Amino acid sequence: MNIMLTLLTNVTLASLLVLIAFWLPQLNAYSEKTSPYECGFDPMGSARLPFSMKFFLVAITFLLFDLEIALLLPLPWASQTNNLKTMLTMALFLLILLAASLAYEWTQKGLEWAE
């Protein structure tokens, strides 16, 4: 009997809360609530917004470096070698390669945000 009373109480309270959640927002509807929110952009404007090519290049560079770090950096530890010197040499070589490519991007002004 106690289980039935508990279940009935829980179902009643849950149903009451769901009904309140559906009815309460409809009582004070105003124009800003009914308009779609598009991250600050006008939803009725042009869908072709200007796109910064510099942003695209910086994003692609970030993705390339991120993939290099995620895929190449664990390689020395995954090579199943017992020689610590070989593993550390491989890791150091990969870090030097990443640092050199970052320096190259920097000197070519690939990381400059402003034009």
From Swiss-Prot:
Topology of the protein relative to the lipid bilayer: Multi-pass membrane protein
Gene3D superfamilies: NADH:ubiquinone/plastoquinone oxidoreductase, chain 3
UniProt cross-references to InterPro entries, sorted A to Z: NADH_UbQ/plastoQ_OxRdtase_su3, NDAH_ubi_oxred_su3_sf
Keywords: Electron transport, Membrane, Mitochondrion, Mitochondrion inner membrane, NAD, Respiratory chain, Translocase, Transmembrane, Transmembrane helix, Transport, Ubiquinone
Predominant localisation class: mitochondrion
Function statement: Core subunit of the mitochondrial membrane respiratory chain NADH dehydrogenase (Complex I) which catalyzes electron transfer from NADH through the respiratory chain, using ubiquinone as an electron acceptor. Essential for the catalytic activity of complex I.
GO CC annotation, single: mitochondrial inner membrane
Family: Belongs to the complex I subunit 3 family.
GO molecular function: NADH dehydrogenase (ubiquinone) activity
Reactions this protein catalyses: a ubiquinone + NADH + 5 H(+)(in) = a ubiquinol + NAD(+) + 4 H(+)(out)
Protein name stated in the entry: NADH-ubiquinone oxidoreductase chain 3
Subunit description: Core subunit of respiratory chain NADH dehydrogenase (Complex I) which is composed of 45 different subunits. Interacts with TMEM186. Interacts with TMEM242.
Catalytic class of the enzyme: translocase
EC number: 7.1.1.2
Organism domain of life: Eukaryota
GO-annotated biological processes: mitochondrial electron transport, NADH to ubiquinone
Pfam family, one: Oxidored_q4
Transmembrane segments: 3-23, 55-75, 86-106
Compartment(s) where it occurs, according to its Swiss-Prot or TrEMBL record: Mitochondrion inner membrane
